[in-house]
Amino acid sequence: MKTEKVFLYDNLCDPDLQEELFGEKFDSDQYMDYVTDWDLVAIKINGDLRKVAIEGGERTTIIGHVNYVPLEKLNIMDKHYGKEFIRIKVTTMLDSDCSLYIKRTDKIKKVI
């Protein structure tokens, strides 16, 4: 099965939530990894407070995991994040080339 490496840093790191939303738990690297040069802001999505990565602003280090998402699940994940997010290519601090979902900055309202 072909997969794409996706850096997950929010509630999608939870294997139980992955199974609920996508019908399976994704394989992931067992160690924590990090991405830098992104800002992490709190916003409300469907009434829930979530932290999301955005370009620009304050640069921070985001902690998460590299997950191996089956290619046939990427469209479902894209729909989960919605049109206000884009999937970009990044390299983590542990040298893993992967995708990262970031919030489109033209569509953001910070709450914190």
Each PLM stretch: what is its role?
Residues 1-112:
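Glycine-aromatic micro-motifs
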